[in-house]
């Protein structure tokens, strides 16, 4: 970061705070390639590792210096005049560089804010699992929740315009607009199949989408704070307002009995709990469904008026937490009553009291999990394990290590599940799939293969959790059995990778 800031200060003194000339600097491409701006971003390196070289970078920069390559030919719209024959490679390189350049104002602002407030960086706050303790603390006291899918912008121009508040260089925005116009399907709707979370050029589109969501949430937070401020306003203001308009027609006692509570209830906005991960968010409240419906239609109008995004109100469902589950971050979360019986002794009489408390219940969605395993050929659609034929050419240790790593990651992430029964079923599928893969490699049956190598072949599947729990508790069988049933949230999980990434 210090080296990056040194380069940036040199360019600032020469270019008057313009970010546009940075695209012609070779070190920017090196920073984009090495992810020197933020090495903690856990994204797959799908770029140009084996193809990038200084010669390719120089060739690309020389092409960008020629002005005729920036001209868009209306007649020859199918011809890529700028990138030439290396369209995919050059497009990937420019996309990564654009992401680095646009991240500069955000990164410098973050560094300055940390230095001013002297905040110690806590990477645990970035963990995905940190959301679930918030659920356990807040959601048992709430009644209704709404799943909200943040709509994708129908035009990439909306994403570019959101950057104009942070990126003050118009040339950089114009160049970004030109790049997206010529090398991406500019006027098409961003569909889930071609979403911004696709594995091609993820960094730039994640930055554009996050800026879009950031502006949406900043406006939403401002309005929510205004509603809370209105909620704390003295009730005398509303009382005087009601009396001013109604004292001629009705006596004061009738106003107090009828109109005043209703009007005060109308102005009092509920305290909303808001949680988001990527494009999915949850709004939860303790109030009535009527006020939740008001928030729903407000969000729809808010998207249409501010971001020109059309959304159907019927796609936002309001569910009662005690009767429905929330599908969020791979868990099925619901609120269930936890009844405990307490014996009370009063002089010579004793009686039992049922104490009902609400508790957050987190379950593993077994059917989608089996579907994911079937998609990557660990089992069929019914959940019966099958051999992984594409791994049969690897060594035995490599095959076992892959299966153990996938099983360990799944157990690590779903350690917060209230019930581990379905999770052990997933582990059974992986174990038997591993044995069938090894038996296929050695051209043998599963029974004869296990007899020949013994039961110690798959001990790593059992010792994986013991190694994790031994770091937290003493190694004792009774303690381990007790905590296997409990749930533990880990604060070191920064991203979710699907099983396809393990190929």
Swiss-Prot record:
User: One GO molecular function term?
Assistant: RNA binding
Species of origin: Rubus ursinus (California blackberry)
What is the official name of this protein in its record? Answer: Maturase K
Similarity comment: family membership? Belongs to the intron maturase 2 family. MatK subfamily.
Q: Which InterPro entries match?
A: Domain_X, Maturase_MatK, Maturase_MatK_N
Question: According to its UniProt entry, what is the function of this protein?
Answer: Usually encoded in the trnK tRNA gene intron. Probably assists in splicing its own and other chloroplast group II introns.
Q: Which Pfam families does the UniProt record give?
A: Intron_maturas2, MatK_N
Q: Name one GO cellular component term.
A: chloroplast
The cellular location(s) given in this protein's UniProt record come to:
Plastid, Chloroplast
Q: Which GO terms describe its biological process?
A: mRNA processing; RNA splicing; tRNA processing
């Amino acid at each position: 970061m210090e080296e990056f800031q040194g380069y940036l200060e040199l360019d600032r003194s020469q270019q008057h705070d313009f970010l546009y000339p940075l695209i012609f600097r070779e070190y920017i491409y090196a920073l984009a390639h090495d992810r020197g701006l933020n090495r903690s971003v856990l994204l797959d390196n799908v770029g140009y590792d084996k193809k990038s070289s200084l010669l390719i970078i120089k060739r690309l920069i020389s092409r960008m210096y020629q002005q005729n390559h920036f001209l868009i030919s209306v007649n020859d719209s199918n011809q890529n005049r700028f990138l030439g024959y290396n369209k995919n490679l050059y497009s990937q390189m420019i996309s990564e560089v654009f992401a680095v350049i646009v991240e500069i104002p955000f990164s410098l602002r973050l560094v300055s804010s940390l230095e001013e407030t002297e905040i110690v960086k806590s990477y645990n706050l970035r963990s995905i699992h940190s959301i679930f303790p918030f659920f356990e603390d807040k959601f048992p006291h709430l009644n209704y929740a709404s799943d909200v899918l943040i709509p994708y912008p129908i035009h990439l121009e909306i994403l570019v315009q959101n950057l104009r508040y942070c990126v003050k260089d118009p040339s950089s925005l114009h160049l970004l607009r030109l790049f997206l116009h010529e090398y991406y399907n500019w006027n098409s709707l961003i569909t889930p199949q071609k979403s911004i979370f696709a594995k091609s050029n993820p960094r730039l589109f994640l930055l554009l989408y996050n800026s879009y969501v950031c502006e949406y949430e900043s406006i939403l937070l401002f309005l929510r704070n205004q509603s809370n401020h209105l909620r704390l306003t003295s009730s005398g203001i509303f009382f005087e307002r009601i009396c001013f308009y109604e004292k001629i027609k009705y006596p004061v006692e009738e106003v107090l009995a009828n109109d005043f509570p209703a009007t005060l209830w109308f102005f009092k906005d509920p305290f909303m709990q808001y949680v988001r991960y990527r494009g999915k968010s949850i709004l939860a409240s303790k109030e009535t469904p009527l006020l939740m419906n008001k928030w729903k239609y407000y969000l729809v109008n808010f998207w249409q008026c501010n971001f020109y995004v059309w959304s159907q109100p019927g796609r936002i469902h309001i569910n009662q937490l005690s009767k429905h589950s929330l599908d969020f971050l791979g868990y099925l979360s619901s609120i269930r009553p936890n009844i405990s019986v307490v014996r009370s002794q009063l002089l010579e009489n004793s009686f039992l009291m049922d104490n009902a408390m609400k508790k957050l219940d987190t379950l593993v969605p077994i059917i989608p999990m089996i579907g994911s395993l079937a998609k990557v050929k660990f089992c069929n659609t019914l959940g019966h394990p099958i051999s992984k034929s594409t791994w049969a050419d690897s060594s035995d240790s490599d095959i076992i290590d892959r299966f153990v790593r996938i099983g360990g990651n799944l157990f690590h992430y779903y350690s917060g599940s209230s019930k581990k029964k379905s999770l052990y079923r997933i582990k059974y599928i992986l174990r038997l799939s591993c044995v069938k893969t090894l038996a296929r490699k050695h051209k043998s049956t599963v029974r004869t293969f296990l007899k020949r190598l013994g039961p110690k072949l798959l001990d790593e599947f059992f010792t994986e959790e013991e190694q994790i729990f031994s770091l937290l508790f003493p190694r004792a069988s009774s303690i381990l059995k007790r905590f296997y049933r409990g749930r533990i949230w880990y604060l070191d999980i920064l991203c979710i990778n699907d099983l396809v990434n393990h190929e």
